[in-house]
């Protein structure tokens, strides 16, 4: 997604997040898809012009859009599959193809472009504005109207065992950009040895971004720190597959540690669910959790337009939730998809709750379509009615699940309840 040139806008009334523990009541001026000024509410009236479109977010906390470091967008509609525990990811992959071939085939029958859109919508609903997609950068992901930003400059390989020629993949990675690979995803010797296999191939350097790292030990952490490699963890996925949580007191020894939500094939839910899971079961502090979905993944993914923050000259990528008076980091402890009531990406409104529709100018909400998910209605800048109709032609009426949550078009939901 690219920022879109448009008239000047002003977000007013919200408590604006400047950092994990820092906020100010401010007027946020946006033009050309970027934040041009952040004015204190105390003296901001002098900078307010009558021709600016105003969005009233009084009573809300304005946060930076979240950065999801790791997802497989094409699997958003898949159910959680497996009969754990497993020893490693290869064992899991072999098992689900033997146990659930019909389920896998049915979901793969949904055209990939449709599934990618649902992956974007799943992230949008959770307040994610930028996502790292671990698979090819298919053309659909590069459309200007795709629901969220997808990182475009990166290299990737699946894993040491399943990634093919990793040397070639690394050589094809743009200079200075991340090379992302699953590693040490399991609890056995095969998983533990992968880090050293990557080292022997000469792939461990400051561009290396490992995903999972469950089997990494202290010696491995020392190697990663020496090579300045980064790590992305997906705790709920590890817990489901292997019955083991990542030791974040150990893994936090790497230079940069971010959080990703992985795919619904193995994960607990969306990125907000993953944040709460990590805080509850892995002992991640509110401050660390905030950094793991904002500044740190932005750094790991080499983002350069203030993604993960609210800053003058940066992209106007912001989300809004009801303000409970706590710090931004503390707010994450209870945040779920149902709390995200407003999302703007590049100055363009992408999501609005029903309660906020009347506060946002019509010019900003025109073209949004309603989606009912788990009893919550959100208006989205996506052709959700057509997407759902085409998806249900294959999966069956009422059978579509987005991140294991049921999705409906609100009118269809009303008809269903009336029967």
Task: List the predicted regions and their residue ranges.
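Short active-site segment of divalent metal-dependent hydrolases/proteases
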Residues: 68, 73-75, 185, 265, ...
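Active-site core of metal-dependent hydrolases
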Residues: 133-134, 138-266, 282-284, 418-419
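Active-site microenvironment of metallo-dependent hydrolases
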Residues: 1-31, 36-49, 90-91, 97, ...
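Divalent metal-coordination and catalytic microenvironments
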Residues: 14, 28, 33, 59, ...
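Structural motif of enzymes handling amino- and sulfur-group chemistry
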Residues: 271-278, 294
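Metal-associated gating/positioning segment near the N- to mid-region
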Residues: 52, 57-120
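Short, charged, surface-exposed loops that flank catalytic or proteolytic processing sites
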Residues: 283-291
